[in-house]
C-alpha cells in the first residue's frame, strides 16, 4: 500500500521505528518549543498532507510513553484522517499530567496507523418491529462488573 504525502520544507515522512511497528511516527512541525500546561489542549501541525487510498483511513494514536510518563494524550483518540481529506494533518494533544510538557521541534508526537474502512448501509426500522433481542440488551457502561 502506498500513501502519497505532500511535505512542507524540512518535514520528514512518517516512519516506522521498528520492523514490526503498526504505527508510523508523526513529528511536530514547529519552529520553537511549545509548552503544554496541565489541563491544556493544543493543536500541533505535522507539515504533512496525505492522499489515502479509498477504502482506508489513517488513525492518529497517542505514543504510549507520553501517556505513561507525562499524561500527554491525543484527545480524540484515535483521530481519523479520511481518504478524501487533503488538508494538513494536525494532532490535538492534551496534558492530563501535573506538570508543563514541552513539545520540541521535530519531536515524535503521535503515531499513524493505516486501517481498512467499511462503509455500512444504515436502515431505519419501525420501533414496533424493532431490533433483534440479545441477552445483553441495552446494558452498557460497566455492566459486566469491575473484576
Curated annotation (Swiss-Prot):
- Name the positions where substrate binds: 63-65, 76, 80-82
InterPro entries attached to this UniProt entry: dUTPase, dUTPase-like, dUTPase-like_sf, dUTPase_trimeric
- What reaction gets catalysed by this protein? dUTP + H2O = dUMP + diphosphate + H(+)
Which GO BP terms sit in this record?
Answer: dUMP biosynthetic process; dUTP catabolic process
Which GO molecular function entries does the Swiss-Prot or TrEMBL record give?
dUTP diphosphatase activity; magnesium ion binding
Question: Is the keyword Protease assigned to this protein?
Answer: no
Q: What SUPFAM superfamilies does the record tag this protein with? A: dUTPase-like
The entry's family comment says: Belongs to the dUTPase family.
Q: What is this protein called?
A: Deoxyuridine 5'-triphosphate nucleotidohydrolase
Tell me which species this is from. Chlamydia abortus (strain DSM 27085 / S26/3) (Chlamydophila abortus)
Q: What is the lineage of its organism?
A: Bacteria, Pseudomonadati, Chlamydiota, Chlamydiia, Chlamydiales
The gene is dut
Amino acid at each position: 500500500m502506498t500513501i502519497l504525502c505532500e511535505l512542507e520544507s524540512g518535514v520528514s515522512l512518517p516512519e516506522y521505528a521498528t520492523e514490526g511497528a503498526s504505527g508510523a511516527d508523526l513529528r511536530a512541525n514547529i519552529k520553537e518549543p511549545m509548552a503544554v500546561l496541565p489541563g491544556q489542549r493544543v493543536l500541533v501541525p505535522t507539515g504533512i498532507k496525505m492522499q489515502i487510498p479509498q477504502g482506508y483511513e489513517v488513525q492518529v494514536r497517542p505514543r504510549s510513553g507520553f501517556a505513561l510518563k507525562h499524561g500527554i494524550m491525543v484527545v480524540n483518540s484515535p483521530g481519523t484522517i479520511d481518504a478524501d481529506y487533503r488538508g494538513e494533518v494536525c494532532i490535538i494533544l492534551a496534558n492530563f499530567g501535573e506538570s508543563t510538557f514541552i513539545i520540541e521541534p521535530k519531536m515524535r508526537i503521535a503515531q499513524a496507523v493505516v486501517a481498512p474502512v467499511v462503509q455500512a448501509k444504515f436502515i431505519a426500522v419501525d420501533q414496533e418491529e424493532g431490533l433483534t433481542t440479545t441477552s445483553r440488551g441495552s446494558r452498557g457502561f460497566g455492566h459486566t462488573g469491575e473484576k
